[in-house]
Amino acid sequence: NPVDDIXIAKPRDIPMNPMXIYRSP
């Protein structure tokens, strides 16, 4: 899933990728 990569690659972009919160706390 690209969402997982985004969250891991850009954990600082939480506001842009709220899914990253669930994937990478």
Swiss-Prot record:
Entry's Gene Ontology cellular component terms: extracellular region
Tissue: Plasma.
Any one GO molecular function term: serine-type endopeptidase inhibitor activity
Mod. after translation: Phosphorylated by FAM20C in the extracellular medium.
Localization (cell): Secreted, Extracellular space
Main location: secreted
GO biological process, one term: blood coagulation
Transmembrane segments: none
Alphabetically ordered keywords of this record: Blood coagulation, Hemostasis, Heparin-binding, Protease inhibitor, Secreted, Serine protease inhibitor
UniProt function note: Most important serine protease inhibitor in plasma that regulates the blood coagulation cascade. AT-III inhibits thrombin, matriptase-3/TMPRSS7, as well as factors IXa, Xa and XIa. Its inhibitory activity is greatly enhanced in the presence of heparin.
Subunit-level organization: Forms protease inhibiting heterodimer with TMPRSS7.
Protein family: Belongs to the serpin family.
Protein known as: Antithrombin-III
Lineage of the species this protein comes from: Eukaryota, Metazoa, Chordata, Craniata, Vertebrata
